C-alpha cells in the first residue's frame, strides 16, 4: 500500500504526516512537495512597476524553488520516519498548473492507494472549512483521500 502525503511545510501538513505514520503504518510513503519557478508564480501575483524579475537556474541546473521543495520533501520524510514510518521517500514535483493537479497526477503515477493532506496549507486564500488544495484533491483524485484536521487547541 503506497500512501502519498502532500507536504508544504505548514503545521497542518506536519500533522497529516505524523497521523499517517503513526496510525496507518503504510509502506511505502511518498512525501510530495510541489514547486514552480518564481516567474510562473508571478503570472498570477501583482507585480511592482519597474522591478525586473528573472528566474535563473543555478550551476546545478536547478531553480532555487526546486531546491527548496527538495529540502522540504526531505524534511517531511524525516518527520514521517520520526513518527514511526519505516520507509518514507521525499519527492519534489514541478507543478505545471494548480498544486492540487500535481498531487493528483503524482498519486496516479505512483498508484497511491491513499492520498493524505492536511486540512489547510500555506495558500493565501482559504475556504472556511477545508483549504482549496485539499478540497480539490478530494474531488479529483479518483482514489481514497484522508484530510487530517489540525489538532484541537487543548490537545
Task: Report each predicted region and the residues it spans.
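Structural beta-alpha unit
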Residues: 71, 75-115, 153-155
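Short, hinge-like loop/turn segments at secondary-structure boundaries
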Residues: 47-50, 106-109, 133-134
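Small-residue (primarily alanine) positions within well-ordered alpha-helices
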Residues: 13-16, 20, 69, 107, ...
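A short acidic, glycine-rich active-site loop
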Residues: 52-71
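Small/aliphatic-rich secondary-structure junction motif
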Residues: 1-58, 83, 87-89
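Glycine-rich, Arg-bearing micro-motifs that act as flexible, cationic patches
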Residues: 100, 114-136, 140, 150, ...
Amino acid at each position: 500500500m503506497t500512501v502519498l502525503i502532500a507536504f508544504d511545510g505548514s503545521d497542518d501538513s506536519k500533522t497529516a504526516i505524523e497521523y499517517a505514520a503513526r496510525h496507518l503504518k503504510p509502506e511505502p510513503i511518498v512525501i510530495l512537495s510541489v514547486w514552480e519557478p518564481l516567474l510562473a508564480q508571478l503570472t498570477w501575483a501583482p507585480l511592482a512597476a519597474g522591478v525586473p524579475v528573472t528566474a535563473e537556474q543555478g550551476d546545478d541546473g536547478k531553480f532555487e524553488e526546486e531546491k527548496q521543495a527538495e529540502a522540504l520533501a526531505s524534511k517531511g520524510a524525516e518527520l514521517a520516519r520520526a513518527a514511526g514510518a519505516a520507509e518514507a521517500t521525499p519527492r519534489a514535483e514541478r507543478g505545471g498548473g494548480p498544486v492540487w493537479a500535481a498531487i493528483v497526477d503524482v498519486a496516479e503515477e505512483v498508484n497511491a492507494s491513499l492520498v493524505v493532506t492536511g486540512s489547510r496549507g500555506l495558500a493565501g486564500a482559504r475556504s472556511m472549512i477545508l483549504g482549496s488544495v485539499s478540497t480539490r484533491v478530494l474531488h479529483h483524485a479518483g482514489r481514497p483521500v484522508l484530510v487530517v484536521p489540525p489538532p484541537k487547541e487543548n490537545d
